[in-house]
Amino acid sequence: MTPVVALVGRPNVGKSTLFNRLTRTRDALVADFPGLTRDRKYGQAKLGELEFIVVDTGGIDGTEEGIELKMAEQSLLAIEEADVVLFMVDARAGLTAADQAIAAHLRKTHKKVFLVANKTDGIDGDSAVSEFYCLALGDVYQIAAAHGRGVLSLLELALAPHLETLVDAAAEEDAQDEEEEDFDEEALLRMVAAGDLDTREDTKETPFADLPIKFAIVGRPNVGKSTLTNRMLGEDRVIVYDMPGTTRDSVYVPMERDEQKYVVIDTAGVRRRGKVHETVEKFSVIKTLKAIEDANVCLLVIDAQETITDQDLSILGFVLHSGRSVVLVVNKWDGLDQKVKEDVKNELDRRLGFIDFARVHFISALHGSGVGHLFESIQEAYQSATRRTSTAMLTRIMQMAQEDHQPPMVNGRRVKLKYAHAGGYNPPRIVIHGNQLNDLPDSYKRYLINYFRKSLKIMGSPIRVEFQESANPFEGRKNTMTLSQERQRKRLLKAKTKK
């Protein structure tokens, strides 16, 4: 599960500065969802190989009233869902009543809290932070978010348990890779040259073929996620949701259909049947992002009556960036007249044309029309994302792509694609080796991706294609002349001098 780090503190202590520093290596995902805290931001960050989600909860000073109190409550809800809380204070401004009010709340949450004193550059940090020890939150960690001083060591300490888990998972993955079939590059190139590629065994069984398919139902508030969840589980199924101890994660509900096991990840909380018609759905962006990271397939639910919004595109962008398979679900399709339906389809083609590989279903979660076909697309997307393809098959497909459309010329020389092999799955990752691949235009890269998708019949899953430049065996070597060549060179130079 992707860890979540929440930045908490009163206004103007440097939370946004630290947020921007943590997310600078990745494009920050900014989501302004109605009903959530104003100016609340969510971003992806990376520490080594560990990816985590950063939440800027907005300023809290403990004295909010009215609508400000409601916004503060939403920020405190984000704290409850976080794995690590960085409580930021201003070392230059000193301890304030707002700091004490926030600290009192954090002590009650029993969360893993790190007290972070920002803006310690240019002052005596030890003296400035001494008064913050009275907050009873343990050690005070000094940083300068604007310059990055102390940030790395703070993250390594705060995320240490998750880093250890990542190392253990990487070791297991390396052990699995060692068991996989290795191939001899030179032998493969000889087979390519001779046209002797055996593509009969083009796929292999995945090591988790018997595991349940995890799919997450994601989308904006009030698009019918919980209604769809209960419809897929069965209306008579009574599910207790958000029990104590489960608020940090989405609700995982196992189910089985046609002898296929599934795990439904509901980001809105699975309701009892009698509560399906509540007008206000419980919604959390953090739950959605974590569910996307943990799922195999994501069902993005769109309201047909509101068409596509920027929030839908933000969630879809996170799904694709995470490499997850996607199925588009247009809900509330019943009751629309034919002209409105045509307008909705045209809008989908216009704004979502870049994911033409995803299945689109027009359903009514309330009445159940079209819901049963979702399972077919879920299985199709999952199988596309996890199916393994042999090196011989991928290389042959690459050759056919070159035969249909040759790579362009670069500096008078043709870009040469030598061979391709699988570099991973879920999503499928294809590694292509060759010469001058760094100069290959993006248009030809997209052509190769589409050719692989069509040839392998991959639906619902993105494809990652990586290009690795083959090493030049003569790079850095200086040609040496033989004795006869040296003598000939001297004769030519001597003859040229006489002229």
Swiss-Prot record:
Domain KH-like: 387-471
Keywords: GTP-binding, Nucleotide-binding, Repeat, Ribosome biogenesis
Keyword GTP-binding: yes
Pfam families from the UniProt entry: KH_dom-like, MMR_HSR1
Disordered, as annotated region: 476-499
Binding residues annotated for GTP 2, in chain numbering: 219-226, 266-270, 331-334
Keyword Glycoprotein (UniProt): no
UniProt: GTP 1 binding residues: 9-16, 56-60, 118-121
Organism domain of life: Bacteria
Record InterPro entries: G_ENGA, GTP-bd, GTPase_Der, KH_dom-like, KH_dom-like_a/b, P-loop_NTPase, Small_GTP-bd
Matches recorded under PROSITE patterns: G_ENGA (PS51712)
One Gene Ontology term of the molecular function aspect: ribosome binding
Feature: compositional bias, Basic residues: 488-499
GO biological processes: ribosome biogenesis
Ranges where the EngA-type G domain occurs: 3-166, 213-386
Family classification: Belongs to the TRAFAC class TrmE-Era-EngA-EngB-Septin-like GTPase superfamily. EngA (Der) GTPase family.
Record HAMAP family: GTPase_Der
Assembly mode: Associates with the 50S ribosomal subunit.
UniProt function note: GTPase that plays an essential role in the late steps of ribosome biogenesis.
Name of this chain's protein: GTPase Der
